[in-house]
């Protein structure tokens, strides 16, 4: 069995192994093995050269190295001479031997090949090499042996690392045992499939392994050709067979005598390539160094312990800097007679080479050619080539023959040569014992003695001589110098650390170490030299001077005292007493600027802990702390610097800001008492809390911690303190305390007439109002109780001044100061922060209601806000004759809730003969209905025209700024509004904006040339500032100044009051809030941002707000707009609690918004939830205290959950205590919402508590106050929640405002208590009715918004939240889920843009309360049909449908029909009234409650258990329920046709479908007939509403159940097919004008009249008296009263007597005898004026096929049948305006009265209509019959009927006579004796002819006559 020799080469600490590997099967009995490492390096280091030893190495050494030199010198001289030259020449090879056992054979591996030392006798490599070197035997051509390196030296040089035995490692060559030579068969070459060049950082990949092939290829011999390798002497290679070679990385075919081109694999590189393993049965062949392919090592099969060898795979360095090659070849072992598999090659993918490569030529197969010296082998990827398969006959088996040892005997004595032995003896004898180690020297002695004995002995043979020679030589060679102790001492010295010793002793050590190392490295050093070096180095080590222990300084912490603006750096110091520490310096920098330096020296640096404090640091600035320590350990001063530490003080605390007032509240026994004027300290403070009211934030409640008396800055005060988590307050020096402090002044008693306390001042003046009173300091009116409406109710006649020539102020007036002042003086006193909120009171002013006598107010400035009902003014309401106000100023807001046009003025309301001069006003005036001006709205001189005009009732030299915005202005102007007749307003300037009013003067007095105009002069506006109307002639002439001109003019007025500043009171100074201007880093350019950020981070201190604000871009909206509110959102839902949010909406005062995204932040305070605004990098905190409110929430819940909607609590609250109380609650329709509120109480109450007043700490008194308030108002609170929950779920785009309305009312910028607002809403029944939602908003909710009414509020939100540009589209969008809105504009060109849309109609006063209910439909499905005259409300449920989609088609058809109807009337109506169709208040049309399951009861139930949602959600809350009354529908009309209470109610019938539309035309006729359809003349006297609808103006349809279809009427709505089967015009839209309609009506009536006439002629032609009496009946007069004027129609059969006397010869006889065909209408009395469900006679429809011949001309009002019939005939003959209006309306009533007629009669009317042509209707009818007969006789338009062609009267008459004749055959006598006849044939013919003529003439667009 064969075993392989494995060879590998690796880089060994900078020494590159050779490239090719080789192996050879060896001699038969190799018993031992050794590992050889051949190192090829062009230059061995000088250190290695110095250590080369001459002679032979000790064979007992396990490891040694043999050194060869290229044979470049003549082979002369000794080894010493060679070593001498060694420094100048190149060492060529180094063979490292690792010896494990006895060596069987030696392989010397050179750069290009293999040298084999063949025989067993040559197994000793030392001996062999020695012979080769000493005896000159050239066994290794080109090299000579130089010397060797011992194992220890190899270790020193780092070459020992290749000698590890444990496993196969790169860089090792192993010779292993080979037991028996065997033939090697079936060997294939291993080829590299590929070679990879990859970038340095690219990942390594493995390519697929090549497939194994069992086929054999012939071997190729390779002979060493590299001159750099030692060669085996000829003749000594007998035992070696040529080894088969595989070239790794090249392509070498194994065919004998063939040349193979080798493709070079890679270029050399500085980077090692990946290693690969190559295994081939037999002998692996090493590649050339320049062609070495990188192979990846692969684990080899494990060999027996004694045979294990370590392999190394060469690594090749690529020259391409960015790439490295990697290739893996896996070797395999093969056994005899087995096919050798081709090695597997793992090849990563090849990346593109950056440079081209060249392929060197190969001279002979198996002998690679090295590149020229000036070339490098190029690197290129190798494309694998498949080797050709060797034919079977070429396969061969090769065997290695056994070597033979043959001994030939010769009988001659051999000579003995002892010369060499002698030489060795001489050499050994000359050795000195001091030059070598004792052991080696002692070992030489015995050998020398033995050698000498052999030398002296004669009978020795040459072998013995040789043996002893060799032994001696070996012993000499074994002489050595022992450097072990030296090396150990050097190693010990190197373990020393420089830092531990003094510089001088350390330097001495380094000197001696260097010397010792030279000795150790010197191979020629003697043992004595070594010993001396050891002694000196040991002594130097012992003399090292050790340094003292280094001190250790550690920065352990930085203690930030944020409130004190201080940071303390704390350190620990170790070894502080072992070394001299000179100083420790802590330096604090801000950027590069050194802020502070703390130097610690002496005893301050001897403690274990030290610190450095830095004070007066700025917040939010990054400081750098640098710490340096200087010390001396013995080498002089050393400096150590610690790592820099960043320090930043970030102050983030809760600070109460923008405080309006602070009150000390005592809550005890359910009563809240303001104790802000305490005079003693209470013993029990637990029921006290501070109530801090902000100008724009929530009120904060703080439990009082302590109240104490103290003196601050000389002022005795009560100091009230409170503490809360994170709460701080700012001290006078802008420092902080961790408590809130409020000071209450201890009253100071007055001194003479100088007063220091407002309460005492009021009491004094009230007691004696005639004296002079002076203010000794500024004082607050807060919490002082007035004596009435004003603080001082008695008439003030004294003086009010400031003392000591100063300007003091009375602050925080909450009521007017005086009622009346007479002959009084108020001078040099300011009134600041006036807060008079009395919206329910009249005559509100800061100083007085009335100013009389010679009263004077001068040098006074007022600031603040006043609100009242009627008459609100800044100073006084009314100035009387002789009074004067001069050099005064008002800054603030005035608001009037007036509805009657009272006066609102910045200075006064009215000035009657007084003087106002040098007044300055900068204010905003708002109100409902008021006369308003910023100075004085009314300047009144009176009617006395005397010489004082212009000196009294004067307003002059004044200036105004600000704005006036009054909803319903009554003479509004910036300066003044009313002066008639001769008040004087002059020389004044306005910078103000007037929203709805005049820019300067507010009324047409300015154009009154007789009186007022001349005294209104020199009024100036300012370009770019002032605005408003200039509606009057003179107004347009007023000058507009530039800003510069205006300022200059104002300067000439010498007004100083606007600049008056009062001294703060001592108390005000103590409680003064620091302005932002005093805060660090304040920037005036960001002032708006700071104010706005109070809304984004409401809790945080001003310093933090400034810090955050300064991060913004100056142009950002947060710095350029005013923020009203900031609200958290989660997607599109408003978050009003502490639930998670992901964005905020910022609402600005200009009605715009921004959204900003949020991310969570962990940097908030314990009681403040914080987010980061990711868009801006600043913070946001919800305005909710983060605390546990569970107890309070549960307490409130327990109070509310016990209250039911139907309960005694609720009855008492709403004052519904009678029998109707249950239904009164039901009438609110709030059950569903109330249930929803009760089911969500916990959530709702939590939000309520969180959004109510802030409770920063735990105040039991405050909690109890809230509980008691809820208990007291529990019913109101629940109703408030229920109401808002029910009606304010309004959608704007993607958002719904319900959460805002419930818990975030301050969204709109008004500060409000959520709890108080809810209680207010639920406090009155009128506030929570569904039918008053619009009104309730204005009365209760408007004041909390920026809108005056619901319409404005909804519009504001639309603009804010959506991109929808109008309210109508928004309303459709907001209701689309539950309301379908069909809007129809007119198709008449001139009115197509008229108001018709739903929301426009709904917002009118009579319908505006429907808006919120419609916006909050939840389950029902409603529809609206809106046009310019009416709006209809219906539901899908009423139609039996379940969704809006189910009803859209039918609703749309109805909407079209409604519109067509009104358009028809607009085309028809008289010009003077048609515009009335465009109603401002459209007619509401309400659906009934006849649900599919039956009539619904009032509260939405039917079929006992079903809920009718349209009633529950809309009709019921709107109070539109009505009981079933048996009607189909009805209209509610009033005497005034424009009465907004007018409406239409469907009862049994539906509003849609054709009949529903027809009913629509019926009911709206009732609404519109008087004012529009009848020309504005109203109903004709003696008739009423029902006479005009059905049977006259209602559009007839089929299927109604009534007899109107086929009766007289007009189709105003529907388009029908012109198919010859129609009764009415087929398309009413084709009648474009009134003339078109009249033409239609003419043809319509002509045709009917002609057919009546022909029927009569045909019957009469039968000359049958019985037939006549059966065919006709009578329309008789039935007088309504005794005056026999007004009549009814009495239709009856002829009496027997009349039958007997009946004589009919012509149509005229029928007329005269008032006869009609005996068909419908039926017999009875028909009353046109009846309005009774029991009398249906006015509803009569006159069938078109019924011939009515009589006229029944009345002397008053006609009967119903005659009225309708005559109206149509007159319309047809005389047209709409003359005929129809003349007859059907009261058009001639007034004229008839003038003409002396008591009643309006037919007789009078026909004369008027016919212009006296006819005196009776009968005359008219006879003429009409004659006219149509005459026209027909001349010819008819040709038509065909019943198969007959008709073109003349005679043709038609013939057909009728035949029909009558047939009918006459049915004449019979009934049992009662009356004759009856069927008229069926005649009626059918008549109908057929009519319909044919209608078709033939296209609805009578052409005449029926020729």
UniProtKB/Swiss-Prot annotation:
Residues 1-33 form the signal peptide. GO terms for molecular function: metalloendopeptidase activity; zinc ion binding. It is a multi-pass membrane protein; Peptidoglycan-anchor. Binds 1 zinc ion per subunit. Sequence repeats lie at residues 277-291, 293-315, 361-375, 380-402. Residues 128-1906 are extracellular. It is found in: Secreted, Cell wall; Membrane. Residues 178-436 are annotated as: Disordered. The keyword Transmembrane applies. The active site is at 1563. GO terms for cellular component: cell surface; extracellular region; membrane. Residues 293-375 are annotated as: 2 X 23 AA approximate repeats. Residues 181-196, 421-436 have a biased composition (Polar residues). The Gram-positive cell-wall anchor motif LPXTG is located in the N-terminal part, in contrast to such motifs in other known streptococcal and staphylococcal proteins. The protease could be cleaved by the sortase and anchored in the membrane via the two potential N-terminal transmembrane domains, whereas the propeptide located prior to the LPXTG motif would remain attached to the cell wall peptidoglycan by an amide bond. Its main location: secreted. Keywords: Cell wall, Hydrolase, Membrane, Metal-binding, Metalloprotease, Peptidoglycan-anchor, Protease, Repeat, Secreted, Signal, Transmembrane, Transmembrane helix, Virulence, Zinc. GO terms for biological process: proteolysis. Belongs to the peptidase M26 family. This is Zinc metalloprotease ZmpB. The gene is zmpB.
